[in-house]
Regions:
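Helix-hairpin-helix/helix-loop-helix acidic hairpins
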Residues: 1-37
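Catalytic DNA-binding helix-loop module of base-excision-repair DNA glycosylases/AP lyases
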Residues: 25-66
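Helix N-terminus capping/helix-initiation residues
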Residues: 7-10, 44, 108, 114
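A general marker of short, structured functional hotspots
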Residues: 12, 21-23, 43, 77, ...
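C-terminal accessory module of base-excision DNA glycosylases/AP lyases that mediates lesion recognition
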Residues: 57-125
């Protein structure tokens, strides 16, 4: 696949725009769950397949961190995924996450973003 060797942090704006179109196609054509809200299942499945490109998304940490209401998250469809993905990409442009890579919890830059969100939530609950 064209997505296999891509890293979120390395994408140029043009590459990002192309990737988001490919991901939208996958979002709309992979039937991974019968639930109305596919964002969690989709992001976690794609993170497993494309760990350097996709940040895993969940309700408890990611939805809360971005302060999305349940209806926004539940019914926003691909727009919600695009919102998260765009914010994650922008974050990689602002911070050097490579410096935080290790062999334990921070195995890739997308997992570092996930860990930052979880850590923020745990510190502030």
């Amino acid at each position: 696949s064209e997505l296999n060797n891509l890293k979120l942090a390395n994408l140029t704006k043009g590459e990002f725009e192309n990737v988001i179109k490919m991901i939208e196609y996958l979002y709309n054509n992979l039937f991974l769950t019968k639930a109305n809200c596919k964002t969690v299942t989709f992001s976690k499945t794609l993170h497993f397949i494309l760990p350097d490109l996709i940040v895993p998304i969940d309700r408890k940490f990611t939805q809360t961190f971005f302060e999305l209401s349940n209806p926004q998250f539940q019914y926003g469809g691909f727009d919600v995924f695009r919102y998260f993905f765009t914010n994650f990409w922008n974050f990689t442009k602002q911070y050097n996450l490579k410096a935080l890579l290790d062999k334990e919890w921070n195995t890739c830059e997308t997992k570092i973003i996930d860990n930052i969100i979880i850590g923020y939530h745990l510190k502030n609950e």
